[in-house]
Amino acid sequence: MRFANVTIVLFLLLAVIGAIAGFIGGRIYKKSRMRARMPKHRGLKIEVLARDFTVCKVTDYSGVDLTERFCFVGKTDEENSLVCETSRVPSNTTVREDGWRALRIAGTLDFSLVGILADLSAVLAREKIGIFAVSTYNTDYILLKKDRLEDAVRALEAAGYTVV
């Protein structure tokens, strides 16, 4: 009888140890898989532009100086939009929203790259940071409200991006 009790206790002990080892091993495996799935573009350098921007609607583009360093124009059948430095907002602006800062993905992006903006916006969305994205031929820009800039930088760095 005694031998049977010892056998049962040993069996239960081994089962518990096996369950603990399986749990720990599973967590390690899951973490390594998560790291392996991290997007390859993490590690890209993100530049913080040292100027304030305004997003606005204009009646037409006659007052827009296209020789300025930063000037993003969007024209549709419904509106004429403009993103420019706050100090350069034209007088024929009908609606404007000030207080934006910009992040630029450094370098020239290849058109075959997929998911860069999606990943950046997902990182910022988890922190409840709204964005306004603008793309050029070479790269992408993310505008965000300047009171959330520090939060955005922290979140992007924690996600593996280099922010300068």
Could you tell me what each predicted segment is?
Residues 1-14:
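Feature marks short, highly hydrophobic, charge-poor N-terminal signal-anchor/signal peptide-like helices
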Residues 6, 95-97, 127-128:
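Short, flexible segments with low predicted structural confidence
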Residues 11-25:
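Terminal signal-anchor or tail-anchor transmembrane helices
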Residues 21-123, 151-164:
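Regulatory modules associated with amino-acid/nitrogen control
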Residues 108, 112-147:
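A structural feature that tracks compact, well-ordered secondary-structure segments
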